[in-house]
Amino acid sequence: MPSVAIAGAGLVGALNACFFAQKGWDVSVYEFRKDIRTMKHVQGRSINLALSQRGKSALEAVGLKEYIVNQGVPLYARLVHNKDGKTYSRQPYGKPGEHIVSINRRHLNEVMITQAEKSPNVKFFFEHKVKSVDYDKKQLVVQCTSQPSRIPTFGTKSPPAEHEEFHVEADLIIACDGAYSAVRRSLMTIPRFDFSQEYIEHGYVELNIMANNNEFAFEENVFHLWPRGHFTLIALANRDKTFTVTIFAPFTEFEKHMSTTEEVLSFFEENFPDAYLLLGKEHIADTFNRVKPQSLVSIKCSPHSFFNNLVLMGDAAHAMVPFYGQGMNCGFEDCLVFSETLEEQNNDIASAVQVYSERRVNDAHTINDLAMYNYEELKDLVNKNSYKLRKKFDGFMNAIFPKSWIPLYSMVTFTRIPYSEVVDRRRKQDRILSNLWKTTSTLALIGAAIGIYSNRGRLGL
């Protein structure tokens, strides 16, 4: 059977392992961290994940959808908290019943690793750091950081010494090693490889609202949102009755208004009074004393494939800011699209790799841009009448033309329409709306002119 070497055992790497295990390939996964299933605390991002249709479709393809969805909390709407801490507005995500699912990142990752390992042809090598890719040999360069080494050996060959680099050969290499991908970095000198990176001015800090007498402290089946212009607070429910709370703000805001305990408590009490009471003074103060704001980066690159046997996926190909809830969903869809492409190309790896990149680059760039746009929506637009009016208009049109007029958010979240096509459809909707507005305005002006002409005598004209 063909072999695949996967760099990274995070969400996308673990799901890829499940896909190729299902195909019967020989799978080797190299991960620089220890096995997260054995760790008490896992470093890295823990912003709750919002599982939507693209991610569900990928999980369904490997038989995990039902289990994972049942492990999450369904969210049917945004609940926008006003600054007075007492009034709210509810904004349903889509049609009745349509929802996203709040999922714990670590649990999802552990489930997929365990699922992949059920296949005897799959092996995970933890504490094995992928350093680069060897252009000439088309192999991964890996460094063992564990003792003793768990690198597979054959015959009389001795295992490599501690920290010795070694090469991994496979028919296919998939780099899922994150936003700071070592594989992608080693490709940067290749001519015509385009790359862009942008850190946004905002950072984030995570907090928690604990269960109240083993019950949720407030409504669990909504995405809680406190939009305050240039900074925003969000909260998503967990199965254990807690909420993961995240504040997004410019680094300058953290420095000016959240540098001391007194400042941060005053800031939360003034801007998020209801959340402030549930979080508690001690937890807010302790969190900000221990944790520094984390940065958010947006990355694009093109192409996503090289050498007819190497593919970049997930954050290694398209790290995005988390404001559309599509980072994981897009990464999972990468796995599904590549699996579908392999089947279409009759398992011809070289053809599949090329076709995949051609299909995926534009979509990845598009959702990256949409994620940046959606932050403007989350932090400010949701409170504007123009936004609310457009949302109602889209809902009205969707009820009349359910197949041809689908709201932007619904296309992204509740379908598998390619991201680039989603934007094309939205632009068409915008043109129709613009023409409709012009026509309505013109008719109104004509009507006004007729009225004035008919009453010119009384008006003294």
Swiss-Prot record:
Keyword Nucleus: no
Record EC number: 1.14.13.9
One GO term (biological process): NAD metabolic process
Keyword Transport listed: no
Gene Ontology molecular function, alphabetical: FAD binding; kynurenine 3-monooxygenase activity
Pathway this chain belongs to: Cofactor biosynthesis; NAD(+) biosynthesis; quinolinate from L-kynurenine: step 1/3
InterPro entries in UniProt: FAD-bd, FAD/NAD-bd_sf, Kynurenine_monooxygenase
Membrane-spanning segments: 395-415, 432-452
GO cellular component, one term: mitochondrial outer membrane
Signal sequence coordinates: none
Protein's name in the database: Kynurenine 3-monooxygenase
Organism of provenance: Caenorhabditis briggsae
